[in-house]
């Protein structure tokens, strides 16, 4: 039997490359807090697999887009209601490693080639993941 090699590493932005905080002022959402080491790690990984980001945060999408593009990657706004179907149609979930922490990410994780949840993800998401970071 031929072993399948994943072609894509798809990461959900909020809670994966951010600490989940969204900082507001009286005018609305202004800031998200991103980890500083993500860029270096993903720069190494992108030599071996295509790295892409998704976000369902419509209000904060410009913030996420700026950070992801500064790191040299692509990002797509995908609301959770259509994410699984869109990813399967455009990438084929069996070709994807998926990393997420959100309430509906477990649905994608169950169909992906391999799935990762960051430490602190929701319990049912961690149970669906092949690996939980430490």
Which residue ranges define each predicted feature?
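Alpha-helical substrate-recognition element adjacent to the catalytic core
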Residues: 1-82
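Mg2+-dependent phosphoryl-transfer enzymes with acidic/Ser/Thr/Gly-rich catalytic loops
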Residues: 28-34, 70-74, 84-134
